Amino acid sequence: MSIPADLKYTQSHEWVRAEADGSVTVGITHHAQDLLGDMVFIENPAVGRTLAKGEECAVVESVKAASDVYAPVAGEVIAANGEVESSPESVNQDAYTAWLFKIKPANPADVDALLDAAAYQKVVESEAH
């Protein structure tokens, strides 16, 4: 699976898409869902919640394990995707369209500091060894 070049990434396997309105959309990467296996439960943060960068804010559970999802940037949660909560398997089907939540960043420059696709590819490769 190729890593989309138009997204940003975190060391903890979240993807981040900058939106035209200044918000960011967050999901888990294909690599993360591949490691976790079949998703059975997703809990997103509440809309209106203020997050610190790196804060545990969502949970994804699969048949193999439960994993925390971390806020890639500080900011306020402005949307949560109820569709992935009711159909967690959609993350397995296409991790890059099945987003989890949206954040209005406290500092938009924080998004630029996240990993690009090439840097994230190196993270994935380093974990494979």
From Swiss-Prot:
Signal peptide: none annotated. The keyword Lipid biosynthesis does not apply. Binds 1 lipoyl cofactor covalently. It comes from the Bacteria. The keyword Metal-binding does not apply. One of its GO terms (cellular component) is cytosol. Keywords: Lipoyl. PROSITE patterns: BIOTINYL_LIPOYL, LIPOYL. Its cofactor is (R)-lipoate. Residues 23-104 form the Lipoyl-binding domain. GO terms for biological process: glycine decarboxylation via glycine cleavage system. It holds the Pfam family GCV_H. The modification N6-lipoyllysine is found at residue 64. The glycine cleavage system catalyzes the degradation of glycine. The H protein shuttles the methylamine group of glycine from the P protein to the T protein. Belongs to the GcvH family. The glycine cleavage system is composed of four proteins: P, T, L and H. HAMAP family: GcvH. This is Glycine cleavage system H protein. The lineage of its organism: Bacteria, Pseudomonadati, Pseudomonadota, Betaproteobacteria, Nitrosomonadales.
